Amino acid sequence: MTSYTFSRELRLLTPAQFKSVFSNPIKASSAEITLLAIPNIEQHPRLGLTVAKRFVKRANQRNRIKRVIRESFRLNQHDIPALDIVVLVRNGVMEMENADLNKLIEKLWRKLSRRYNG
Protein backbone atom coordinates (compact mmCIF):
# COMPACT_ATOMS: atom_id res chain seq x y z
CA MET A 1 0.00 0.00 0.00
CA THR A 2 1.24 3.48 -0.86
CA SER A 3 2.11 5.70 2.09
CA TYR A 4 1.02 9.34 2.04
CA THR A 5 2.72 10.50 5.24
CA PHE A 6 4.95 13.56 5.45
CA SER A 7 7.72 12.09 7.57
CA ARG A 8 11.02 13.62 8.60
CA GLU A 9 12.85 11.94 5.71
CA LEU A 10 10.71 13.93 3.23
CA ARG A 11 11.88 17.30 4.60
CA LEU A 12 14.90 19.48 4.02
CA LEU A 13 16.12 20.13 7.55
CA THR A 14 19.57 21.70 7.67
CA PRO A 15 20.84 25.01 6.26
CA ALA A 16 23.33 23.03 4.16
CA GLN A 17 20.49 21.11 2.50
CA PHE A 18 18.68 24.37 1.70
CA LYS A 19 21.87 26.03 0.45
CA SER A 20 22.64 23.20 -1.97
CA VAL A 21 19.28 23.73 -3.69
CA PHE A 22 20.10 27.38 -4.43
CA SER A 23 23.15 26.45 -6.52
CA ASN A 24 22.09 25.87 -10.14
CA PRO A 25 18.46 24.78 -9.55
CA ILE A 26 15.68 23.68 -11.88
CA LYS A 27 12.99 26.37 -11.58
CA ALA A 28 9.23 26.47 -11.87
CA SER A 29 7.53 29.71 -10.95
CA SER A 30 4.43 31.83 -11.01
CA ALA A 31 3.90 35.41 -9.86
CA GLU A 32 3.31 34.26 -6.26
CA ILE A 33 5.43 31.10 -5.80
CA THR A 34 8.81 29.86 -7.04
CA LEU A 35 9.98 26.25 -6.81
CA LEU A 36 13.71 25.57 -6.90
CA ALA A 37 14.90 21.97 -7.18
CA ILE A 38 17.98 19.83 -7.66
CA PRO A 39 18.18 16.05 -8.11
CA ASN A 40 18.95 14.13 -4.93
CA ILE A 41 20.40 10.70 -4.23
CA GLU A 42 17.37 9.58 -2.25
CA GLN A 43 14.55 7.55 -3.78
CA HIS A 44 11.98 10.22 -2.92
CA PRO A 45 11.48 13.99 -3.14
CA ARG A 46 12.22 16.26 -0.16
CA LEU A 47 10.55 19.59 0.61
CA GLY A 48 11.75 22.80 2.23
CA LEU A 49 9.51 25.85 2.74
CA THR A 50 10.36 29.51 3.14
CA VAL A 51 7.64 32.07 3.72
CA ALA A 52 9.22 35.46 4.42
CA LYS A 53 7.73 37.85 6.94
CA ARG A 54 8.39 40.55 4.38
CA PHE A 55 5.67 39.12 2.12
CA VAL A 56 3.27 37.57 4.64
CA LYS A 57 3.17 39.59 7.85
CA ARG A 58 0.93 37.51 10.10
CA ALA A 59 2.13 34.19 11.51
CA ASN A 60 -1.27 32.55 11.09
CA GLN A 61 -1.23 33.41 7.38
CA ARG A 62 2.33 32.08 6.97
CA ASN A 63 1.29 28.87 8.73
CA ARG A 64 -1.82 28.52 6.52
CA ILE A 65 0.27 28.85 3.37
CA LYS A 66 2.83 26.31 4.60
CA ARG A 67 0.05 23.91 5.63
CA VAL A 68 -1.57 24.02 2.18
CA ILE A 69 1.77 23.51 0.40
CA ARG A 70 2.77 20.62 2.71
CA GLU A 71 -0.59 18.93 2.18
CA SER A 72 -0.28 19.24 -1.59
CA PHE A 73 3.25 17.80 -1.44
CA ARG A 74 2.07 14.94 0.78
CA LEU A 75 -0.66 13.96 -1.68
CA ASN A 76 1.52 14.37 -4.80
CA GLN A 77 4.83 13.01 -3.47
CA HIS A 78 4.60 9.82 -5.54
CA ASP A 79 4.23 11.82 -8.79
CA ILE A 80 7.21 14.09 -8.09
CA PRO A 81 10.69 12.84 -9.11
CA ALA A 82 13.51 12.44 -6.55
CA LEU A 83 14.32 16.12 -6.12
CA ASP A 84 15.22 18.40 -3.23
CA ILE A 85 12.65 21.19 -3.57
CA VAL A 86 12.57 24.60 -1.89
CA VAL A 87 9.34 26.59 -2.15
CA LEU A 88 9.75 30.37 -2.04
CA VAL A 89 6.59 32.36 -1.40
CA ARG A 90 6.35 35.90 -2.76
CA ASN A 91 3.90 38.77 -2.65
CA GLY A 92 0.27 38.15 -3.58
CA VAL A 93 -0.09 34.67 -2.12
CA MET A 94 -1.73 36.00 1.05
CA GLU A 95 -4.83 37.09 -0.87
CA MET A 96 -5.29 33.64 -2.43
CA GLU A 97 -7.91 31.23 -1.15
CA ASN A 98 -6.73 27.75 -0.13
CA ALA A 99 -8.32 26.10 -3.18
CA ASP A 100 -6.62 28.55 -5.57
CA LEU A 101 -3.29 28.11 -3.80
CA ASN A 102 -3.66 24.34 -4.01
CA LYS A 103 -4.39 24.49 -7.76
CA LEU A 104 -1.40 26.74 -8.33
CA ILE A 105 1.03 24.57 -6.39
CA GLU A 106 -0.18 21.39 -8.14
CA LYS A 107 0.37 23.09 -11.50
CA LEU A 108 3.90 23.99 -10.38
CA TRP A 109 4.60 20.38 -9.27
CA ARG A 110 3.68 19.21 -12.80
CA LYS A 111 5.77 21.96 -14.42
CA LEU A 112 8.78 21.05 -12.28
CA SER A 113 8.41 17.35 -13.13
CA ARG A 114 8.26 18.14 -16.87
CA ARG A 115 11.37 20.32 -16.68
CA TYR A 116 13.27 17.66 -14.75
CA ASN A 117 12.27 14.83 -17.10
CA GLY A 118 13.20 16.84 -20.14
UniProtKB/Swiss-Prot annotation:
Catalyzed reactions: Endonucleolytic cleavage of RNA, removing 5'-extranucleotides from tRNA precursor
A Gene Ontology term for the protein's cellular component: ribonuclease P complex
GO biological process entries: tRNA 5'-leader removal
Keywords attached to this entry: Endonuclease, Hydrolase, Nuclease, RNA-binding, tRNA processing
Enzyme Commission designation: 3.1.26.5
Molecular functions (GO terms): 3'-tRNA processing endoribonuclease activity; ribonuclease P activity; tRNA binding
Pfam families named among the record's database cross-references: Ribonuclease_P (PF00825)
UniProt keyword Hydrolase present: yes
Family per record: Belongs to the RnpA family.
Function: RNaseP catalyzes the removal of the 5'-leader sequence from pre-tRNA to produce the mature 5'-terminus. It can also cleave other RNA substrates such as 4.5S RNA. The protein component plays an auxiliary but essential role in vivo by binding to the 5'-leader sequence and broadening the substrate specificity of the ribozyme.
HAMAP family linked: RNase_P
Subunit structure: Consists of a catalytic RNA component (M1 or rnpB) and a protein subunit.
PANTHER family documented for this protein: RIBONUCLEASE P PROTEIN COMPONENT
Name this polypeptide is given: Ribonuclease P protein component
Organism (species): Shewanella denitrificans (strain OS217 / ATCC BAA-1090 / DSM 15013)
Gene: rnpA
